[in-house]
Amino acid sequence: EFQKVFTTGKSSANRNFIVYVLPKENQPHFRIGISVGKKVGNAVKRNDVKRKIRASIFELREEIQPDLDFIVIARPSVSTLTSQEVYSNLKHVLKLAKVMK
């Protein structure tokens, strides 16, 4: 299903994130995939970035449309951002992707 989102979904990006979005009919809640490549840093740094992304998505969950599958890909520049910067950058790219209500 990840591959289907990559191949047929629409993409949006900013300096720190790429988001692929695929609408899914009759889905009660959104589903998300998070990808953080090795260029971001070692395993500890990558897990830290994933935690920050998950926390940001958790805060934004009420504003995200429920009938979507989407994948968030972190670019290497994300490793230097604080949690608040990750939140604002992620919110920006999700608005570009028209994921927000």
Set out the residue ranges of the language-model regions.
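Positively charged, solvent-exposed patches that mediate nucleic-acid binding
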Residues: 1-101
